[in-house]
Amino acid sequence: MSQSFELVSQYKPQGDQPNAIRQLVAGINEGKKHQTLLGATGTGKTFTMSNVIQQVNKPTLVIAHNKTLAGQLYSEFKEFFPNNAVEYFVSYYDYYQPEAYVPQSDTYIEKDASINDEIDKLRHSATSALFERNDVIIVASVSCIYGLGSPEEYKELVCSLRTGMEIERNDLLRQLVDIQYDRNDVNFTRGTFRVRGDVVEIFPASRDEQCIRVEFFGDEIDRITEVDALTGEIKGERNHVAIFPASHFVTREEKLKRATKSIEAELEERLKELHDRGKLLEAQRLEQRTRYDLEMIHEMGFCSGIENYSRHLTLRKAGETPYTLLDFFPDDFLIIIDESHVTIPQIRAMYNGDQARKGVLVDHGFRLPSALDNRPLKFEEFEHKVHQAVFVSATPGPYELEHTPEMVEQIIRPTGLLDPVIEVRPIEGQIDDLIGEINERVAKNERVLVTTLTKKMAEDLTDYLKEVGIKVRYLHSEVKTLERIEIIRQLRLGTFNVLVGINLLREGLDIPEVSLVAILDADKEGFLRAERSLIQTIGRAARNANGYVIMYADRMTKSMQIAIDETKRRRSIQEEYNRKHGITPKTIEKRIPDVIKATAMVAEDGEEYTSHAPKQKMSKKEREAVIERMEAEMKEAAKTLNFERAAELRDLILELKAEG
């Protein structure tokens, strides 16, 4: 269905926005492959991009570098485009411990994961929308470059039903089973169907409230209705409905047979190779595991870890590019890479990290070499799939500078807000000085961000501020991804006034209430005090009319000087514009948006767990708190590839749960 994007907003483009929109749209229409929007913090980059999307009218993929940022962008685009398909596509794992082997200790760790059902639904909604309409915006994390099933297979297996269509009821049931729907007449949930006489009810994988009721008269479809899955209330009549597969990894039976033959051939070849090299243990291990998987595929149509055979299932050659979300888009689509200075390096690093882990599994006989082809895209493959891209950043990185020497600048804010004033103060007595500044802001009902260099300093500072009666929270790396949104929300609501953190950049902290950003140890050169990081951190105070930044330092580093000079340059351009147009700066008014349902279920307590499970008797509540903290540490350990620690924690958690 062809439909145009319809931007709904009470605002009109202002400041630098009209010029930025005009330049970007012209560049896209001229066929430019890469463009960069250098947009200062708070200049309304999302609104600019929304106007660009409306004018070029192409399906758009927006890539953010983490789930938190993707969640914020999803909420904003959904508000701007209420009548179009705005979708969300991130990794559906709440916890993911990849399969791994540690040769030093001869430890094999099985894959372990917990899937978030709400996010899985949103992923299905995203892919099905791309086949049903053109007016689609998908906000995704970098996980969109990981392998998915074949889009052709996915599209071919869509079950298309119309009123008056001749089809036997049992043929429809077989079709549904083929696309991985389960029959369940009792527990009716996403990805299932139930049968009552001549009525078949199907619960699509992309929905969580409404199902499709198909009524038969003999071998003909008599009526199709959309029904509330809980109450049974009819929501509307349908002449046609498309039921998309319940899994992105669907394969026809004949393809499955070809795949198993191909797996067997690879197994024989690999076993010969291992025997020739005298690796008998590895050969025995590989044969046992692969034969078991093949038997499961023969009997059940799938096996645990079937994605490791994806090259065979999609009939690809060794080393061939895997299918990803990008292949589900039509040829002429637009990619917007948000915070590109962070996102591009992340896309570049994905492949190497994945191959290092899988290479160990292959070498030691846990997987066939074809498992290496179940992977994210290499950076060159990603570049090849990009039709047209717009990089968006306040501090573009080397890749953007190389590919788009001429940048589209957006420095003027629609609200007239200026880049903050920066003051450098000595380190001696910095904490007492900071407390005085915090109290001044709290009295005006404003918020403060404090960034430190080490975890220890952040913890000590948080404890000290609490002791002197300041409402403060510490945002550390082990806070669950989706809990961060809730912490940011509480800061905005005034539940607490000061947020302390080490790397406050990655959160995408758009908080208009923040009037002071304090940077401790600003003169300690390194990633967190490099020019890009400093400019990004300074930008956190640019959404408030009283925005102010204090750098505590004993010397002026090159990075500090560049960041201060760039901020002054932008501020002078903004002041000149305000003077010319008679604008008085005013703080951004940004309502606290509704977030994705999956983000609402967050833990009450953000403390981190650092010790083993205590052996003494605990109450149920205490045990639950310990389990929650251990799970946070387990996820962090898996994320940093510390597989042994993650597996150890997983076992301790299972013990504690068993005791409960």
UniProtKB/Swiss-Prot annotation:
Detail which positions bind ATP: 39-46
Domain Helicase C-terminal: start-end pairs: 430-592
| Localization (cell) | Cytoplasm
- Extract the Gene3D superfamilies matched here: 6.10.140.240, P-loop containing nucleotide triphosphate hydrolases, UVR domain
- Its Gene Ontology biological processes? nucleotide-excision repair; SOS response
Listed InterPro entries: Helicase/UvrB_N, Helicase_ATP-bd, Helicase_C-like, P-loop_NTPase, UVR_dom, UVR_dom_sf, UvrB, UvrB_inter
State the span of motif (Beta-hairpin): 92-115
Q: How does it assemble?
A: Forms a heterotetramer with UvrA during the search for lesions. Interacts with UvrC in an incision complex.
Name used for this protein in its record: UvrABC system protein B
What is the species listed in this Swiss-Prot or TrEMBL entry?
Halalkalibacterium halodurans (strain ATCC BAA-125 / DSM 18197 / FERM 7344 / JCM 9153 / C-125)
